[in-house]
Amino acid sequence: MATADTTHTMLSALFDALLQTNDTFTTVRNRVRVMKRALDQHVEDPFAHECSLSQMPRPVIPAPTPAPTNRIQPEGIITMWATAHFEIHGGGQRLATSERAPRIIMHVSPTTVRLEIPLTTYIPEKRMRTGSKLRIAILKGTTHNAETGKFDEVAWQRLVLVLTKKTPHPSTLVTNYWTCEEQGLIRPVKSTGSNMIAATPLNSLTLELPGPDADSQYEQLTCMPMSCVFE
């Protein structure tokens, strides 16, 4: 090692000085002091001493690479969640609204968007109509990057870009199951189809899904969890 070689050189020089019989005690002591100062400087800054011996330029130690501020990789999958608004529409009017504001999970890759929609329940405001639709509205500001827990403009832009890469109103297949509660009994209700349509109006994302295909007044409606992929 360079440090060991340097120390060996200093000690050899010290011993040589001690062996010179013509030197006085004071001369040897002064040389020892010089060696001690050199060793102290070497401990404080080894590079400076070695460079002075070898006449080599002082090495440049690169600064540590800072951690990236944006941890999203262009090729990776971004997971987002959003608080959404769920409504059942039919006949040009709103028929029911979700009891709560459920959260949708969105996994966005460079080529696909996979949605995970939780179970939702509805208290009908009006009588159900055949051909109804379930509408889900997501405002831009309610979306969060699952990694940071905060709104992420990069993630939102990728979501919109991937969804609309082929058409402004992409569609995909989805299977949803509805149940209704009527006079204390729960029974299945036929769905109005199997197609989901997405749109991205200004600063929002809207989804239109099949609704309950029934013409009756219910106490409560439930839509089972769903998963679908836009590609």
UniProtKB/Swiss-Prot annotation:
Family: Belongs to the aquareoviridae NS3 protein family.
The name this protein goes by in its record: Non-structural 3
Species, as recorded: Aquareovirus G (isolate American grass carp/USA/PB01-155/-) (AQRV-G)
Lineage: Viruses, Riboviria, Orthornavirae, Duplornaviricota, Resentoviricetes
